Regions:
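Conserved non-catalytic scaffold segment of RNase H-like nuclease domains
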Residues: 2-96, 102
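Substrate-recognition/cap helix-loop segment adjacent to the acidic, metal-dependent catalytic center
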Residues: 94-115
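Alpha-helix capping at helix-to-loop junctions
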Residues: 80, 87, 104-108, 124-127
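Generic secondary-structure boundary/loop-capping signal
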Residues: 19, 62, 112, 118-119
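Short alpha-helix plus adjacent loop in nuclease-associated cores
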Residues: 116-135
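Internal, well-ordered alpha-helical segments in soluble enzyme and binding-protein domains
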Residues: 74, 135-137
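Short coil/loop linkers at secondary-structure junctions
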Residues: 60-63, 109-111, 125
């Protein structure tokens, strides 16, 4: 079986209507043949909407986002690098929806019906706190 682990980071403020701009993508594929990795920062559509969290995530080196390749180019590379996998693994449903929509916007379909959401899996095993969240990030 071939697994594709995807991690996204996105820039979003509470008042933003949508999920925000993806500014970092990291993918790792595990199969019996070995492991493949790909990770990149992406250029933000609106650099003026940068949040403090995003600045902290890039260690206040904003030039990495200003000079990064466009999101479409990064996602096209991901589609070429990881053309087939059996199981897609992400942290949360929000992250899955954001990745699915971003890939769809670039003309790519996710090639699996098997999706594992670690937050939901962990929530089923670990007793959540009062607000229904797992006690760590």
């Amino acid at each position: 079986m071939k697994y594709l682990f995807v991690t996204l980071m996105w820039n979003a403020r509470a008042e933003m209507p949508g999920p925000g701009d993806i500014f970092a993508v990291c993918c790792q594929s595990y199969s019996p043949n070995g492991m493949t990795r790909y990770g990149r920062y992406t250029h933000l559509d609106d650099m003026s909407a940068l949040t403090q969290w995003t600045k902290d995530a890039v260690y206040h080196n904003i030039t990495v986002l200003e000079t990064a390749k466009p999101r479409k180019e990064i996602l096209n590379t991901i589609a070429e690098t990881f053309p087939a996998y059996d199981v897609l693994v992400l942290w949360s449903r929000k992250e899955y929806e954001l990745f699915r929509q971003a890939m769809h916007d670039c003309g790519h379909r996710l090639c699996t019906a098997k999706v594992v959401l670690l937050e939901e899996l962990l929530g089923a095993v670990v007793r959540p706190r009062k607000r229904g969240r797992v006690p760590f990030k």
